[in-house]
């Protein structure tokens, strides 16, 4: 049986924890959003369910009509993902929602069609209009509370806080220079500045005494004689002191006690006073009490409203409803579970489920935040400001949440329409049902817009499996609600200590997006709040346990974490008394007794792609970044080869990318060919499972996707085994390039500036040959002038040009094509305006002859040549124009189809009955099963299941059965659910087939009669100008392909395959490539594959030992001989095997020349760029170069007749034709443009002819 090859390693023991599923971030999130496979009553209040529950019920303005949401139901996809790509349609399911409408006429329930929802494929992608797309996860500022500080121009530090909700108005509070706190709402600083005390009163704390009680500890002090004065003078009163009989006020809450006040109180026989402990006249709260213009709840509300909405009448009702709407109405203000979690964590509130479900602001939150702010001001050591770049304050919005927000805005739009329709409905003429007032357009258009146009919905990078995998694990700080790349500063982009194990510090693009687009680290997961977690081993009493704890960045702050490479003995205790550890973002040597956790693996720091770089620890980070990014650009080769020196992640990356086919259960291979593998499962060999292989499909990047079986008939397969290789994989391992024998030496100057010299042998062996597939599409439409026709009968085209076209005008498969060849012949009716005047005259005289047509065939564009490998034709069938024979044939076809469908249904029912029997027969019912609608007891508790009872259950649907949760019934529910889904899928497939037979391809765009897609495959060999790279950021361009005989050779006559420049190593500091070369040489000689995981790879000494064991020079250097002269080079040269990739920047796609082509209308100069068939611009610097040589006539020619002198161009053409040799240049058009521009500025510039 085939197994992935074992790799030799120096690692002492394997990782304690396996990598999680690498595309879990996508799949888990979307699964949670749709909750497919769950019954309506079992669905949690998350995702789509949560949105419906939030928006509904909708009430009419007079509350006489109520529309309630009951449940939603998802259909099954009409086509498979591959078929959707082929047809250019969206892979989606129908969404039907059950509503209940209550009005004066009674209660009505109805299921309403709400459009379609795209669903995710098994690989974590979406297919939108035939293109595979990925929704990138977004990193944004977490809702919750943040405390900050800024320096005032006078040098004072001003503290502030911000309460950021998930949806709604921001609330900010900031100290001013006088130690007063002001509240700002929605960041509109100047206009909406409100004293914090006024805001507190507006929340309902009306009296000064209430406010003081909230902020200070209150103590009762006795006042018996003047001796007590010394303890009381200067203290702050916590309550008003008044004489109850005469209502005379001796002191107000918040006032500072003076000797005179105390005397008056003593005289009035007041014996006890309430004092605010720790308060003094400089305390911000006391200062604000004195400053506050309001003294009651009502006055504060009005003042708040006046400042918020200046110019509007401040009535109490308006003011109250405004503050309620701003912060206390869950439809307008929502902290979200995350915001509440962050707020409670920071302010020390309880974290129970009930508290976390409160999504609006509470009075306690504002008071708690102000208390914390004052503690910061007072210099309390336990209070700290927040770092907004810390991952505790940044969270990830995955695909499910992003789409949920879109659905929310779509349904909110729909809510307004529904309410309007309810109010405008005429009950006298018609009865109201849900379907009449619900418009599905709102939801459908929002989803279409998001998947098609959002910055986070991206065309999947499918160059190779790694590119695909990385794209799904990408994190972006851009997009709606995120940052703007122009305004993002250095701090946001920088690597932060909290990124350890969560976000890869290496993998990010070079250029304007650096640091804003990042990648998830290899072991990282995203928790329910959207924070990134990373796993650690727990250390108890100095023993490193195998228990794993996933921690968010804020929890980790309190821990002391040892490195995964710290030495342990056989009892899992630290060998040394001290080890390197991290705590609060600092690395230091810690006493092992203080360590609380330990890293799971050294590679948890980096992402998957970075983890594929061997000897990463010896590379400079900048080059490692390039190495990571360039692996994603490697083109899948025709002949794949796994790296000799790997890191051990190759197999896992290939498996999770979805490029290879993996067995889903144990079994035996029953049948194998190039298109499918059939496996008979171990538990039931009759239920054979077929794995269809992808053959020669075009990827998003134009590369070829082809899967090859790896197993043979009779092989025993275990679940998880690789049964077929895909693009850029070899024996189930990632294989992006080739192991090449290289020499680091200069060679006749050809490898100057990182250029690469390769041997012709590599070309002969097809080592770097790749296949590209281009798709060309042509549609025939029904136009105003008549139907377009796809035909072989094209006007004015010779027979030899049509040689490769079939009878129907479509090119035959296998034809070799080059630029300009016709792929599909098409003629379209000519309009009257396109006729020449003499033609029109002849028509007027001789009458209308058959309407003329013009050639609109699809031809091969310049720069493309290859072999036609596939043709797909989609066409509509006109039911009225079918002949009798066609109708008879159709009827026979439909009959066969129906027969097949019935057979499949009966097989499915038999299978289901067998499974039910195996589960239930002769078992006791653990609880009663009740019919949901009729309330009949179908199975009594304790009944022994017999055949009759099982048949009774078999006829019921899952929705109608009420079963208490228990192990047996949970399995039963799963069986029922699978059976119903399979039945539904069979039915949809049958209906789709019937529709196809009757109407053809009905999902073509409106007005399209026929659509043809032609796929041309071209073989690209390695050529001069192609870009190549290693895995260490060592990139270069092929400068020369040298005959094998001329290449340097070793003493044994073996020629080197590639020559690299040694000067590319020292300044770039990527020594990993040199170590890889040595280890590759030793491993190749020994005939083994090795793995050297990041940070725990082969030490230098072990590589030298291996070299000596294999009889190779200890320093890895050998003498080479010049292939041209046979002489030995003076010095020894580093030679060995290095893994080199061919990148998708091929010279064939970039090189371009123009003879004739389009001109710009304004300047009359040729356009620029390959896509526009543009020319090369002879710019000012090039002019200077020619001026330096004084070539006046050549310059005049270049700047006039060869460029934009319109009349001169024509004259020179004529003179060339006639064979004359004269150059008369006129005025360049660009000079006329300059004159016109100056005239536009009001300057009258005219060229004047001056007589010599």
Curated annotation (Swiss-Prot):
InterPro entries in UniProt: DNA-dir_RNA_pol_bsu_external_1, DNA-dir_RNA_pol_su2, DNA-dir_RNAP_su2_dom, DNA-dir_RNAP_su2_hyb_sf, RNA_pol_bsu_bac, RNA_pol_bsu_CS, RNA_pol_bsu_protrusion, RNA_pol_Rpb2_2
Catalytic function, reaction form: RNA(n) + a ribonucleoside 5'-triphosphate = RNA(n+1) + diphosphate
GO biological process: DNA-templated transcription
Keyword terms: DNA-directed RNA polymerase, Nucleotidyltransferase, Transcription, Transferase
Keyword Zinc: no
PROSITE patterns: RNA_POL_BETA
EC number(s) reported in the record: 2.7.7.6
Pfam families per UniProt: RNA_pol_Rpb2_1, RNA_pol_Rpb2_2, RNA_pol_Rpb2_3, RNA_pol_Rpb2_45, RNA_pol_Rpb2_6, RNA_pol_Rpb2_7
Any one GO molecular-function label of the UniProt entry: DNA-directed RNA polymerase activity
Enzyme class: transferase
GO CC, one annotated term: DNA-directed RNA polymerase complex
Subunit details: The RNAP catalytic core consists of 2 alpha, 1 beta, 1 beta' and 1 omega subunit. When a sigma factor is associated with the core the holoenzyme is formed, which can initiate transcription.
Family: Belongs to the RNA polymerase beta chain family.
Function statement: DNA-dependent RNA polymerase catalyzes the transcription of DNA into RNA using the four ribonucleoside triphosphates as substrates.
Descriptive protein name: DNA-directed RNA polymerase subunit beta
Organism: Chlamydia caviae (strain ATCC VR-813 / DSM 19441 / 03DC25 / GPIC)
């Amino acid at each position: 049986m085939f197994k992935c090859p074992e790799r030799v390693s120096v690692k002492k023991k394997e990782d304690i924890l396996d990598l999680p599923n690498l595309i879990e971030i996508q799949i888990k999130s979307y699964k949670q959003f749709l909750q497919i496979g769950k019954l309506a009553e079992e669905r949690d209040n998350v995702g789509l369910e949560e949105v419906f529950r939030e928006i509904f019920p909708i009430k009419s303005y007079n509350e006489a009509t109520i529309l309630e949401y009951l449940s939603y139901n998802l259909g099954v996809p009409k086509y498979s993902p591959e078929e959707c790509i082929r047809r250019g349609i969206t892979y989606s399911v129908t969404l039907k929602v059950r509503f209940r409408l209550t009005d004066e006429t009674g209660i009505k329930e109805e299921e309403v069609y709400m459009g379609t929802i795209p669903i995710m494929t098994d690989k974590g992608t979406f297919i939108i209009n035939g293109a595979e797309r990925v929704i990138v996860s977004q990193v944004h500022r977490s809702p919750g509370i943040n405390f900050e500080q800024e320096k005032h121009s006078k040098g004072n530090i001003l503290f502030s806080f911000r309460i950021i909700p998930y949806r709604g108005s921001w609330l900010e509070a900031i100290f001013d220079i006088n130690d007063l706190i002001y509240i700002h709402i929605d960041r509109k600083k100047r206009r909406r500045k409100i004293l914090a005390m006024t805001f507190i009163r507006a929340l309902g704390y009306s009296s000064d005494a209430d406010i003081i009680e909230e902020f200070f500890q209150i103590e009762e002090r006795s006042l018996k004689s003047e001796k007590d004065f010394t303890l009381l003078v200067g203290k702050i009163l916590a309550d008003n002191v008044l004489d109850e009989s005469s209502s005379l006020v001796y002191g107000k809450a918040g006032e500072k006690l003076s000797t005179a006040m105390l005397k008056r109180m003593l005289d009035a026989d007041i014996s006890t006073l309430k004092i605010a402990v720790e308060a003094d006249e400089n305390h911000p709260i006391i200062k604000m009490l004195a400053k506050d213009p309001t003294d009651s709840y009502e006055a504060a509300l009005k003042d708040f409203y006046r400042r918020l909405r200046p110019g509007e009448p401040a009535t109490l009702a308006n003011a109250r409803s405004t503050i309620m709407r701003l912060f206390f109405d869950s439809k307008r203000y929502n902290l979200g579970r995350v915001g509440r979690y962050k707020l409670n964590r920071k302010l020390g509130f309880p974290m129970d489920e009930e508290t976390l479900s409160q999504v609006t602001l509470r009075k306690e939150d504002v008071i708690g935040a102000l208390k914390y702010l004052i503690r910061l001001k007072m210099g309390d050591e336990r209070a700290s400001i927040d770092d907004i770049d810390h991952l505790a304050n940044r969270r990830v919005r995955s695909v499910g949440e992003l789409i949920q927000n879109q659905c929310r805005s779509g349904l909110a739009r729909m809510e307004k329409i529904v309410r309007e329709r309810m109010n405008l409905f005429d009950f006298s003429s018609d009865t109201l049902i849900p379907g009449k007032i619900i418009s599905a357009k709102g939801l459908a258009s929002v989803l279409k817009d998001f998947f098609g146009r959002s910055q986070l919905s991206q065309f999947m990078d499918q160059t190779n499996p790694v590119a695909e995998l990385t794209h799904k694990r990408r994190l972006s700080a851009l997009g709606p609600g995120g940052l703007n790349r122009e305004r993002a500063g250095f701090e946001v982009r920088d690597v932060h200590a909290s990124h350890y194990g969560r976000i890869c510090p290496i993998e990010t693009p070079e250029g304007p997006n650096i640091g804003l687009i990042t990648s998830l680290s290899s072991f990282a997961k995203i928790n329910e709040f959207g924070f990134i977690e990373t796993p650690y081993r727990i250390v108890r009493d100095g023993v490193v346990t195998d228990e794993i704890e996933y921690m968010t960045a804020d929890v980790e702050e309190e821990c002391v974490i040892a490195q995964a490479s710290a030495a342990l003995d056989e009892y899992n205790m630290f060998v040394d008394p001290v080890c390197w550890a991290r705590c609060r973002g600092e690395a230091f040597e810690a006493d092992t007794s203080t360590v609380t956790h330990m890293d799971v693996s050294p590679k948890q720091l980096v992402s998957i792609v970075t983890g594929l770089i061997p000897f990463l620890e010896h590379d400079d980070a900048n080059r490692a970044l390039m190495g990571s990014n360039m692996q994603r650009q490697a083109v899948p080769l025709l002949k794949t080869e796994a790296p000799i020196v790997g890191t051990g992640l190759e197999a896992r990356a290939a498996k999770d990318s979805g490029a290879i086919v993996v067995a889903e259960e144990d079994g035996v291979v029953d049948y194998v060919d190039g298109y499918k593998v059939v496996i008979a499962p171990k538990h039931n060999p009759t239920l054979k499972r077929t794995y269809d292989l992808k053959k020669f499909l075009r990827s998003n990047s134009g590369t070829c996707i082809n899967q090859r079986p790896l197993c043979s008939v009779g092989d025993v397969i275990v679940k998880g085994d690789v049964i077929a290789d895909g693009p850029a994989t070899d024996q189930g391992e990632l294989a992006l390039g080739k192991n090449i024998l290289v020499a680091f030496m200069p060679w006749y100057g050809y490898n100057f500036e990182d250029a690469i010299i390769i041997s012709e042998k590599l070309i002969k062996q097809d080592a770097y040959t790749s296949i590209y597939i281009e798709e060309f599409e042509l549609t025939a439409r029904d136009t105003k002038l008549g139907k377009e026709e796809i035909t072989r009968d094209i006007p004015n085209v010779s027979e030899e040009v049509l040689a490769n076209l079939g009878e129907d005008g479509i090119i035959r498969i296998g034809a070799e094509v080059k630029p300009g060849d016709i792929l599909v012949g098409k003629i379209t009716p000519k309009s009257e305006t396109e006729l020449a005047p003499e033609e029109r005259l002849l028509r007027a005289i001789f009458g209308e002859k058959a309407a003329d047509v013009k050639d609109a065939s699809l031809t091969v564009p310049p720069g493309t040549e290859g072999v036609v490998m596939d043709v797909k034709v989609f066409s509509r069938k006109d039911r009225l124009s079918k002949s009798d024979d066609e109708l008879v044939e159709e009827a026979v076809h439909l009959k066969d189809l129906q027969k097949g469908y019935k057979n499949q249904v009966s097989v499915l029912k038999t299978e289901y009955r067998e499974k039910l029997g195996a589960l239930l027969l002769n078992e006791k019912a653990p609880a009663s099963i009740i019919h949901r609608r009729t309330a009949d007891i179908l199975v009594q508790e304790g009944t022994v299941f017999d055949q009759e009872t099982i048949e009774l259950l078999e006829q019921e649907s899952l929705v109608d059965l009420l079963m208490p949760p228990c192990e047996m019934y949970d399995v039963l529910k799963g069986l029922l659910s699978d059976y119903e889904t399979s039945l539904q899928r069979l039915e949809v497939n049958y209906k789709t087939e019937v529709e196809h037979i009757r109407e053809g391809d009905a999902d073509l765009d409106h007005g399209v009669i026929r659509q043809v897609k032609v796929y041309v495959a071209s073989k690209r060999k390695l050529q001069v100008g192609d870009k190549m790279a290693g895995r260490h950021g060592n990139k270069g361009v092929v400068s020369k392909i040298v005959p094998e005989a001329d290449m340097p050779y070793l003493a044994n006559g073996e020629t080197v395959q590639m020559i690299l420049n040694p000067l590319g190593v020292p300044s770039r500091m990527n020594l990993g490539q040199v170590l890889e070369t040595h280890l590759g040489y030793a491993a190749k000689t020994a005939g083994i594959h090795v793995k050297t995981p990041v940070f725990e790879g082969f030490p230098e000494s072990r590589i030298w030992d291996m070299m000596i064991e294999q009889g190779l020079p200890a320093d890895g250097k050998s003498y080479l001989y010049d292939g041209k002269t046979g002489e030995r080079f003076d010095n020894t040269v580093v030679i060995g095997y290095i893994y080199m990739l061919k990148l998708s920047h091929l010279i064939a796609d970039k090189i371009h020349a123009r003879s004739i082509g389009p001109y710009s209308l304004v300047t009359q100069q040729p356009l620029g760029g390959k896509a526009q068939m543009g020319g090369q611009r002879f710019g000012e610097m090039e002019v200077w170069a020619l001026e330096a040589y004084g070539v006046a006539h050549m310059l005049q020619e270049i700047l006039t007749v060869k460029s934009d002198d319109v009349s001169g161009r024509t004259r020179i053409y004529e003179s060339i034709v006639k064979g004359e040799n004269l150059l008369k240049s006129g005025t360049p058009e660009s000079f006329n443009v300059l004159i016109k521009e100056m005239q536009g500025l009001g300057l009258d510039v005219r060229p004047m002819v001056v007589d010599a």
